[in-house]
């Protein structure tokens, strides 16, 4: 009904794939957005700019701190190492998209009972290894976090990763665009990994679909960080966005909507890892380590030179228009033509909610039946994975790389 009301024609296959990605729970927050809007978003030190994917705080003396947190639960439940690692990469690029350097990582993890659940132990071991591998390779310290275990997380895991960035206020990317500006895709090549990942992350976990989990490459991410910061200093970037959930579909539509512009994109110009990718796969691939940049044509030579210096790929995939439309082409063939705000603002769902009945049956003060001595109870508590030292976890993280860490884990 929402589509019929706003488009009034039959959608193409590419348009359907784009909407499926952008309107997934993972990308649109269609169930939670109304609740998230209740949280405060303004304050004396909060800097609000169009298109930012991280919170920006003015900390004085001309400097800012950027903060971003997100979950990567579904991918981590299927492929814990890759799922956790790409979660780290995603939050780092969201920090970078504001024009700040990522300087620290945190994580919050939840698993099943690792004392008697082999699958929970497997998830725990590989999620921690994935976070450690990605952060350590990038040279960004993981300086804090938390880990808890409970049977309610059986066969699943909660993997929240946060990143903090730092930079000069004067060097923040002030997202803007003018008709005729060029749209660039820089970083890793586009492949089949992560195709349909946002829809997959919004579904019930009923089976293993490892192809929907993205492949991490922290070495390319490190090169992207340095290239982006150099391009920022050279004033080559008008606007920038990370390619995360939904891939190009979401990055293009959300950038166009937030800036009030139109974007024309030719999928033939996207650099590929696999030459036989279909246009639909190109649009919804969630291959990692990719950034969307809008630049003035006069800056193309400079930004290309910077990318060549750091040996990362750079492709001109489109241009900015003033019609506020998302136009996807393959050569001269139109594959999708939709209003950018229609794509980016998916319909919201007001789900029914009620207080769980079992809560009323719980005693307010449960009677303790344990007759063990207090010393034995204390020893059992200290042996619990929830209370015991997390040394095994944080010793895998390089929390001193960069020699800026003052308060260390543990």
Predicted regions, residues:
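Glycine/proline-enriched, intrinsically flexible loops and inter-domain linkers
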Residues: 1-410
